[in-house]
Amino acid sequence: MSDVRSVVVAGSRFGQFYAAGVAADPRFVLRGILGQGSRRSRALAERLGVETWCEVEALPDDVRLACVAVGGAARGEQGPALAEALMARGIDVLIEHPLLPREWQDLLRSAERLGRRCLLNTFYPQLPAVARFIELGRQLHRRRGIRHLDAACGVQVGFATLDILAALLEGVGPWSLESPSNDLSAMRGLSLVLAEVPLSLLVLNELAAADDGRMTLLQRVSLTTDRGTLSLLSPHGP
């Protein structure tokens, strides 16, 4: 029996990166793109030489995994409902962040009820530069102890940034959060403690109405030990 798994990708905007990754991995076969019949979806499918579908019910029976690159309520999209419909078809789901807490809780309950797997993908910790920063940061933390963390991010990648910090510290508890200040701009400062390490977090709390992918700030993380500072200036390096 072949170990290669058949995969569909839902969404063609950010989904194009999932589709390219699946198509390049010999462990998977990309069966097609699940979308709304847009020109972009059709063009992506044509470029990759796969099919397109507009309904979950139309998917082939051999599909075992779906990558849902469709947002949730925070973006006015129906990604969680789509993920639940896919699990009801017997398909495991990898869904893109961010989701509201209630959306994620509901999906976990549905996955348990339906006997499926559902994973929330924060994406950034797997990027090569970020993964290397996490690896080096863990080594420093184990040997010297991190004395302080500084992080800055756009609100769109807030959850992913916290996931990077959790991976770096190998946990989050015990944790605490001070009430945020009433800042005079969209830059909001937060003071936290994660895993007994103090953290200063700056979040650009705004979205462009016409393009939620436009960000003037993505991610920066710095850690300080008694021997110096290690910084990640961008998730793409250095």
Where are these regions (language model features)?
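Short, aromatic/basic amphipathic alpha-helical patches
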Residues: 22, 42-48, 106-110, 162-168
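Contiguous beta-strand/loop segments that form the cofactor/metal-binding neighborhood of enzyme cores
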Residues: 159-238
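N-terminal Rossmann-like dinucleotide-binding module
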Residues: 1-48
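Short loop/edge segments at beta-strand edges and connector loops
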Residues: 54, 95, 120-122, 179
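Structural motif
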Residues: 10-13, 34-37, 69-72, 96-98, ...
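Short, surface-exposed connector motifs at secondary-structure boundaries
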Residues: 23-29, 88-93, 114-117, 144-145
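A contiguous active-site-proximal alpha/beta segment in oxidoreductase catalytic domains
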Residues: 100-164
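Beta-loop-alpha module in the N-terminal Rossmann-like domain of NAD(P)-dependent dehydrogenases
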Residues: 48-110
